[in-house]
Every structure is written in structure tokens, then in C-alpha cells.
Amino acid sequence: MAEGKAGGAAGLFAKQVQKKFSRAQEKVLQKLGKAVETKDERFEQSASNFYQQQAEGHKLYKDLKNFLSAVKVMHESSKRVSETLQEIYSSEWDGHEELKAIVWNNDLLWEDYEEKLADQAVRTMEIYVAQFSEIKERIAKRGRKLVDYDSARHHLEAVQNAKKKDEAKTAKAEEEFNKAQTVFEDLNQELLEELPILYNSRIGCYVTIFQNISNLRDVFYREMSKLNHNLYEVMSKLEKQHSNKVFVVKGLSSSSRRSLVISPPVRTATVSSPLTSPTSPSTLSLKSESESVSATEDLAPDAAQGEDNSEIKELLEEEEIEKEGSEASSSEEDEPLPACNGPAQAQPSPTTERAKSQEEVLPSSTTPSPGGALSPSGQPSSSATEVVLRTRTASEGSEQPKKRASIQRTSAPPSRPPPPRATASPRPSSGNIPSSPTASGGGSPTSPRASLGTGTASPRTSLEVSPNPEPPEKPVRTPEAKENENIHNQNPEELCTSPTLMTSQVASEPGEAKKMEDKEKDNKLISANSSEGQDQLQVSMVPENNNLTAPEPQEEVSTSENPQL
């Protein structure tokens, strides 16, 4: 029996060697072109798709295994960090028991995620890839059977084409050819049916695997987010318990870190605040910051109301001070603003610098009033001129309540008269002159040297005051009281200025440097021609509403150069 088995094994081995030899011989003949090779384009396309599918499947399977390995590593790392936190967390701190539950749930969640990922993703891909080896073997077997089929066909053709025909050999060659053809065609037909199905199954495999992965991630991250919220709340309680202990990031250069801010990992509605500083280096509790912000917001309306009350009080105090200052300044401002208007003041300076130099040269010169005019000799004009003076309306008050303090001014020194300013109260200016024969008599400033136009305003000296809130009303004074007050307040020295002082102002102007004798002669000529222009100033008292109307600018002077100078 043993000898029979050994002989059978030797015969099988010899048969296999003979097949391999015949196959190798056939392949050589096919490569040399001496034998015809059978080809199936449909199968070749399916085989090409299979090899591509196999490569993609093995790559995805390899990446999934690496992903699972990374999850395992992350599980172990997270577990060690949680255990270390639990060890260093003192039992006296708030949230000690809650931290234990968080650590245990964290480990359980990672373990569940790892197991389900390995079962629903990696193992599924492993089953999908396992079928490639079987199909690959069948494709290889089909290739061998194809060579056997080609070899049997070539042998049959050789026997049939031999010169000496042998019926036994021909019958045996036909039998082998039919057998090889049947095996090859059956295997080829199976592969032609299975390969396209396997190739299309890759879509369902990918869908199933990544649906499982996405679902597992969603569940895992949702549960992990809850644990993170719980852990953040525990840390917030601990921070609130020890709010005086602040950790500041320091000792690190800006190049080694992109940001020095320790931001919270979780943003909740209770801790979010628009007023928190994004650049604060400390990790103070956001809840405490939101509470402080809400407290400041509650105090903000009270502070704003207090500021409004303080502003109202300041306005009332300013109005009282203005009332007292207006009564005191009405008599004080009369001294530096007399009603004397000599020929020297009638000449306007070409530039602002000339006007400043004129005031510096003649410290004793007076400011001309808008409506009054005197002759060069200092005597009032004999003809009754009419001056129309008016007080400022309520809309011409101060621009803002805060500017009222700057409007209340004291009397300027006699050497430099104050410039015209917008007054907030309707008090009469110091240049208001009652219509009396003494104030309007004498010479008229309509000489060739100077002419005063009450109707036209110089664009350089005109003042524009924007409308403002209405100032408090002042007690109405009768024209007789104003007249007596202005008469008593006038300075006789200022009203009667010598012609030498009047003309010295003209001499101080650059380009008008003349001798004093020529100026006296000019003054005589001006007094002689003063009667020609008495009609240019008409003074009329407006008794209505007890308001004196006058041109608003106080320095509206238009002059013409004397051709004799």
C-alpha cells in the first residue's frame, strides 16, 4: 500500500512538472509570436478595475487601522491626564466628587468609542478587503487555464497537421483540448460575472464605513462636549473659591507663542460678555467679570442722571453769576469804551498787524462806539445825528452753556480796549450814546480823511454769532435812566481828547510818518469840512420795547485816504 501511494505521488508530481513545462513552453512561443494567445477584452477591463479596487481598499484599510491605533493612544493619554488631575485635586477644593464622575465617564466614553470604531469601521473594511485574495487566486487560476487551453489547442493543431496521422494521438489531443476549454470557459464566465459586482460593491462599503465613523464621532464628541462643560464648571467653581489666586503667563517670548491669552475652551451664555478684555493675561473667572459688568451697567444710568443734575445746577449758577456780572460790568465797561471817535480812529488799518501796532503806540487811544462820533477837536457835533442801536436778540446768545463763563469778562485796561465779543445778555454796551445835542453836536466824521458808515459792515471786522439758547431776561430800564447812567459814566478825559493825541495815532501808521505840524493843519481842514457830511450819520431813538438797535459789528469803519497826506 505504501508503495502504491508513493508511486501515485510520484506520478502526480511528474504530471505537475509536465504541466509547468508545457505552460512555460507555450508562453515562450506566444512571446516569440509562434503561437496564438487567446485574449478577452471584457475580462481584462474587469481585471484592471479589480486591481485598482484592491489597491484602494488596502490603502483605506491601512489608514483605518492607523486611525484606530491613534484613538487607542489618545484614550490612554486622556486616561492618564484625567487620573493625574484626580490625584492632584485636593479634597478640600470644590467639585472634588464631581471630578471623579467626570474622569470615570471620560474613560468609559473613550473605551466605547474605541470598541465601536474597531467593530463598525475597521472590521467591516477588513471583511471587504479579505475577499480580494480569493478573487485574485481565481484570476491567477484563470490565467493558468488559459495557457493550458492555448497549449492544448496548439498541440491539437500540430497533430492534425502532421504528415503521418495517428488516430489515437489525434483523439487524445482533442479530448485534452475539450477538457482545457471547458475548465477555462467556466472559470472565465464566473469571473466575468463576479468582478463587476465586486467592483460596484466598493461604493456601498465606503458609505457604510464612513456613516458608521461619522455617527460614532458625533455621539462621541457630543458626549465629550458635555463632559468638557462639566469639567469647565468644576474649574470655574474652583476659581471662584480661590479668586485671589491669579495665574499670569510670563517668561515666554512673543516669537515662541502666537498668543499670550489663555482663552476658555468652552463659551457659554452665562460667561460671555462683550466687555471682557481679550488681551488680559490673567485667567480670571468670566462669570465674575460678567457680574461686575452687569453691576457697572446698573450704575451707569444713576451716574448719567447725576451728571445731568450737576449740569443743571452749574447752568443755574452760571445764570446767577451772569446776572450779577452784567450789572457790575455795565458800569465797568463804560470806562474803556468811551463815545469818542476821532479822525485817527476813523482810519482803518490795511491789515490786522497795523491795527495791533496802532493800539500799542497809543495806549491812551479810545475805542470808537458804533454810533457816536466826535469832531477832531474833541467837541460833540452841533447837528443832531441819529444813532440806531439795538440789543442782541435771544438767538444771538452764547453758543453753548459751557461757553458762558468765557463771555463774562472784566473791564479791560484803558490802554487796550477789549475786542468786540458776542455777549450773552442784552445789556447795553458801553458805546451806547443817548440822543442828546451834546453827544451829537460838533464836527462830523465825514471829512476826506474818514467817514463812518453805519449801514455797511466791513467784511474784515464783521462778527457773526451763531444762534444760541435764550439768556435770562434782564430788568427793563427806562431811557431816562440809561441816559443818566451813560452821562455819569462817561469820562471827560476820554470825551475830550486833544487833537495831538488823535493825530498821533495816524502818525504811528507805517507809510503815514508826517510831522506833527502837518497833522494839526489836516485836523483844521477836517473840522472845516465836517459840516459837509453831517447827513451820513442819523441818530434816532427807538422807544419800542426799550431796545436800542445798532449795527452788530463794533468796528465797522470805512475810510478813504486823504489825498493831502
Curated annotation (Swiss-Prot):
Source superkingdom: Eukaryota
Induction comment: Up-regulated during monocytic differentiation.
Family annotation (PROSITE patterns): BAR
Residue ranges of the region described as Disordered: 267-565
Record membrane topology: Peripheral membrane protein
Biased composition (Basic and acidic residues): 471-486, 511-524
Composition bias, Polar residues: 376-385, 453-465, 487-507, 526-549, 556-565
Matches recorded under Pfam families: BAR, Bin2_C
Annotated SMART domains: BAR (SM00721)
Record keywords: Cell junction, Cell membrane, Cell projection, Coiled coil, Cytoplasm, Membrane, Phosphoprotein
Effect of residue 214 to E: Abolishes dimerization and membrane binding
Domain BAR: 28-244
Subcellular location: Cytoplasm; Cell projection, Podosome membrane; Cytoplasm, Cell cortex; Cell projection, Phagocytic cup
MF GO annotations: phospholipid binding
GO CC terms: anchoring junction; cell cortex; cell projection; extracellular region; ficolin-1-rich granule lumen; phagocytic cup; plasma membrane; podosome
Tissue: Detected in natural killer cells (at protein level). Highest level expression seen in spleen and peripheral blood leukocytes and is also expressed at high levels in thymus, colon and placenta, suggesting preferential expression in hematopoietic tissues.
Amino acid composition bias (Low complexity), ranges on this chain: 267-296, 422-451
Alphabetized SUPFAM superfamilies for the sequence: BAR/IMD domain-like
Principal localisation: cytoplasm
Coiled coil: 304-329
Gene Ontology annotations of biological process type: cell chemotaxis; phagocytosis, engulfment; plasma membrane tubulation; podosome assembly
InterPro entries: AH/BAR_dom_sf, Amphiphysin, BAR_Bin2, BAR_dom, Bin2_C
Domain notes: The BAR domain mediates dimerization and interaction with membranes enriched in phosphatidylinositides.
Stated role: Promotes cell motility and migration, probably via its interaction with the cell membrane and with podosome proteins that mediate interaction with the cytoskeleton. Modulates membrane curvature and mediates membrane tubulation. Plays a role in podosome formation. Inhibits phagocytosis.
Protein name, entry field: Bridging integrator 2
Organism from which the protein derives: Homo sapiens (Human)
Gene assigned in the entry: BIN2
